[in-house]
From Swiss-Prot:
Name of the featured protein: Ras-related protein Rab-22A
Record-listed GTP binding positions: 12-20, 60-64, 118-121, 148-150
Location of the protein in the cell: Endosome membrane; Cell membrane; Early endosome; Late endosome
Lipid modification (S-geranylgeranyl cysteine), residues: 193-194
Motif (Effector region): 34-42
Renumbered residue ranges of the record's region Disordered: 170-194
Function: Plays a role in endocytosis and intracellular protein transport. Mediates trafficking of TF from early endosomes to recycling endosomes. Required for NGF-mediated endocytosis of NTRK1, and subsequent neurite outgrowth. Binds GTP and GDP and has low GTPase activity. Alternates between a GTP-bound active form and a GDP-bound inactive form.
CDD domains listed in its UniProt record: Rab5_related
NCBIfam families: small_GTP
UniProt-listed InterPro entries: P-loop_NTPase, Small_GTP-bd, Small_GTPase
GO biological process, any: endocytosis
UniProt family annotation: Belongs to the small GTPase superfamily. Rab family.
Length: 194
């Protein structure tokens, strides 16, 4: 079975639950007292998808303003980006649109984008309507899912959908030696003035 490494980065404001999503996916655990990420953290998880193994190389980026300039370093070369907002904080959804804009301008051209509305277990204090977020995700051709890292809602489904959207390895086969070969130019004899 073929193994594919897929770099995935998580973007979004501080406190939206990016680290909790990663911990729930990789370790199947939830820590209500998790500390904010400083810079970025890295974890991996391998899952089977159809006839391939997908090894997710997950970069969880810091959401604080001071670390925003580092984000391009993490999403460069990514197969997918998960942009997370908190359904209980409208401003995190507004900021999400800036992340999408930056990703479209500076990220890989074929990156798979997923929008994750986290903390869907807090439905009574919702500020971002699911329909509005879904409509926005559809308008930018992104995956949309509401998640709860706390209650393990739609976390695995999010990564399965990313696997589904990433072109299969068969769609981009290696060139099979049909590239070109670099050769040295024959050097001309050295001329001397003496």
């Amino acid at each position: 079975m073929a193994l594919r490494e897929l770099k995935v980065c998580l973007l979004g404001d501080t406190g939206v639950g990016k680290s909790s999503i990663v911990w729930r996916f990789v370790e199947d655990s939830f820590d209500p007292n998790i500390n904010p990420t400083i810079g970025a953290s890295f974890m991996t998880k391998t899952v089977q998808y159809q006839n391939e193994l997908h090894k997710f190389l997950i970069w969880d980026t810091a959401g604080q303003e001071a670390f925003r300039a580092l984000a391009p370093m993490y999403y460069r070369g990514s197969a997918a980006a998960i942009i997370v907002y908190d359904i209980t904080k409208e401003e995190t959804f507004s900021t999400l649109k800036n992340w999408v804009k930056e990703l479209r301008q500076h990220g890989p051209p074929n990156i798979v984008v997923a929008i994750a509305g986290n903390k869907c277990d807090l439905i009574d204090v919702r500020e971002v309507m699911e329909r509005d977020a879904k409509d926005y995700a559809d308008s930018i051709h992104a995956i949309f899912v509401e998640t709860s890292a706390k209650n393990a809602i739609n976390i695995n489904e999010l990564f399965i959908e990313i696997s589904r959207r990433i072109p299969s390895a068969d769609a981009n086969p290696p060139s099979g030696g049909k590239g070109f070969k670099l050769r040295r130019q024959p050097s001309e004899p050295q001329r001397s003035c003496c």
